[in-house]
Amino acid sequence: MSVLLGQILDALGGELVGGDREMPISRIAPLDSAGAGDLSFLSNPRYRQQLAASEAACVIVAPAMRELAQQRGACIVVPDPYAYFARATQWWKRNCRSVAPAGIHPSAVVHESAIVDASATIGPLCVVEEGATIGAHTVLKSRVTIGENCHVGARCLLHSGVVLGADGFGFAPENGAWVKIEQLGGVRIGDDVEIGANTCIDRGALDDTVIEDGVKLDNLIQIGHNVHVGKHTAMAGCVGVAGSARIGAHCTVGGGAIVLGHLQLADRVHISAATVVTRSLTQSGVYTGMFPVDENAKWEKNAATLKQLHSMRDRIKALERQLQQSADQGHNGTQ
């Protein structure tokens, strides 16, 4: 299927330079693989060499790349090419791809007390338990489970295998055994949230686990009980957030990072991949806490040295004191 370039411009705006609105567009493609009939984009100037070599019919660029793009061919000039590209993909999916109709798939199991908005889509083999609510235009892909008394807002997208409202990990030690702490809270998901495949968000022990509006969670993320995630925070795959952690708004957490329980992250904190957050972070900024990769033999030597840092610090301080004493004695001797 193809569309006219002018249809995209009418929907999304942008300045067309050196091109024809009647140009047919068959797909949206990366710069390096785009061919005739494809729409592509350049958001990072580092890839300008790919722009010159690209065979795309039209390329979305920033004003700074306008002249270079014109030399190659047709372009759409916009202030933020990456955001324009994102909206172009949304437009393409709405207009060029089949979309599951609203409604509940016959194989889904929805409790009679659950409230599902008429515009929501509940996919095959989903389970929506007692007292749960699903908001307007929300989509549950196949095999999603929404536990009892869990609530999902409007315009959310939950991918296959998501589980909301499994019991949080709560046990009290008693006489060498474990006594289960019943998890009496729920999960509350705000509006415009996307949750990746096989991500699990546990219900709260007493209060709810809360995911605020606009949060984006990748695949295979574990959110423990009583966690609170602020608006428009994004987490990459395999992140783990332990119970009762509170993460601010507009944060990012890189893949495989871990946030320990009961910690607080301020707004606009950005955690690098594979970092283990062991203390609260009260100031916005970028934080990294991981041991870098190296050849194994070198890594083992550095790891062994790392264990000796405390004693090495004491030795260095002692040497500094000795040097200072020697310098003081020499200075006194020359007077």
From Swiss-Prot:
Protein EC: 2.3.1.191
Gene Ontology CC terms, in alphabetical order: membrane
Pathway assignment: Bacterial outer membrane biogenesis; LPS lipid A biosynthesis
Biological process annotations from GO: lipid A biosynthetic process
Record-stated family: Belongs to the transferase hexapeptide repeat family. LpxD subfamily.
Active site: H225 (proton acceptor)
Gene3D superfamilies in the cross-refs: 1.20.5.170, Hexapeptide repeat proteins, MurE/MurF, N-terminal domain
UniProt keyword annotations, A-Z: Acyltransferase, Lipid A biosynthesis, Lipid biosynthesis, Lipid metabolism, Repeat, Transferase
Cross-referenced SUPFAM superfamilies: Trimeric LpxA-like enzymes
Enzyme class: transferase
PANTHER family per record: UDP-3-O-ACYLGLUCOSAMINE N-ACYLTRANSFERASE, UDP-3-O-ACYLGLUCOSAMINE N-ACYLTRANSFERASE 1, MITOCHONDRIAL-RELATED
Keyword Repeat attributed: yes
Function: Catalyzes the N-acylation of UDP-3-O-acylglucosamine using 3-hydroxyacyl-ACP as the acyl donor. Is involved in the biosynthesis of lipid A, a phosphorylated glycolipid that anchors the lipopolysaccharide to the outer membrane of the cell.
Organism (species): Delftia acidovorans (strain DSM 14801 / SPH-1)
Cross-referenced NCBIfam families: lipid_A_lpxD, PRK00892.1
InterPro entries tied to this protein: Hexapep (IPR001451), Hexapep_transf_CS (IPR018357), LpxD (IPR007691), Trimer_LpxA-like_sf (IPR011004), UDP_GlcNAc_AcTrfase_non-rep (IPR020573)
Quaternary structure and interacting proteins, as annotated: Homotrimer.
Domain of life where this protein originates: Bacteria
One MF term in the entry's GO annotations: N-acyltransferase activity
Name of the coding gene: lpxD
Catalyzed reactions: a UDP-3-O-[(3R)-3-hydroxyacyl]-alpha-D-glucosamine + a (3R)-hydroxyacyl-[ACP] = a UDP-2-N,3-O-bis[(3R)-3-hydroxyacyl]-alpha-D-glucosamine + holo-[ACP] + H(+)
Protein name in UniProt: UDP-3-O-acylglucosamine N-acyltransferase
Intrachain S-S bonds: none
